[in-house]
Amino acid sequence: MNYLEFHRQWRPLGCFNVQQIYSWCPDFNRHNLRVWEQKGYITKLRKEYYAFSECKTIPDFNRYIANRIYRPSYISLHTALSYYGMIPEAVVQITSVTSLKTSSFKNDFGEYSYNSVKPGLMFGYEPKTMTDGRAILFATPEKALLDLLYLNPFYKTENDMADLRLDEDFMCEDFNGEIFKEYGERTGSKALNSRIKTLLTAYGL
C-alpha cells in the first residue's frame, strides 16, 4: 500500500489508530507508519494513535484529538471554562474528564490531561461543531464548573470560590444556577452540594 492510498482512506477522519487500520486492511505493513512518521507525513499522538501532520493547520483540530485518543472523554475543567469566557486565564493544556484512569499525553498537537470521575458522572456535555464540521464533546458551563469542584475539594469557602475569578457578567447572565444545582444533586454527594451552594452565594446567585 502506498501513502496516497492510505491518505485517501483516512484523511476524512484526520486521526486514527492501529486497530482501525487493521480492521480496514488486515495485511497492512505496520512499518509504513514508522516510515511515514519519519518523513513527517503523520504524527504520533500516543501509543498506536496517529494524525496527519497537515491537520495542525486546521482550527480546533487539537481539541478534536482530545476526544479521540482517550475514550470515553469530553473536554471540561479549565479548557471548557476558558472556552466559555468564564475564567480570565489562557489555558495551554487541554483538560478533559474521563471514566477511565487519570492520564496525560503530550504530542506535536498539544498537551492533554484526563481526570478520572465515576462513570455515573459522565453527563452534562454536548457537541460543539468545528469550522470543518467535525464535532467536539464539551462540558456545558455548569458541568465544567461542577467537575472542577468535584475534582478539587479544597475549594470550600466563599473566599476560595472568589479565588476562581469567574467572570461575573457570565455568571449573572449566562450561567444557569438551577441546572448547576440539578447536576450536583445527581452526584449524590452532600459535601459537593454544600460547596455548590457556597459558590452560588459567593457570586450572588
Q: Which residue ranges define each predicted feature?
A:
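Nucleic-acid-binding surface
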Residues: Q20, S53-L205
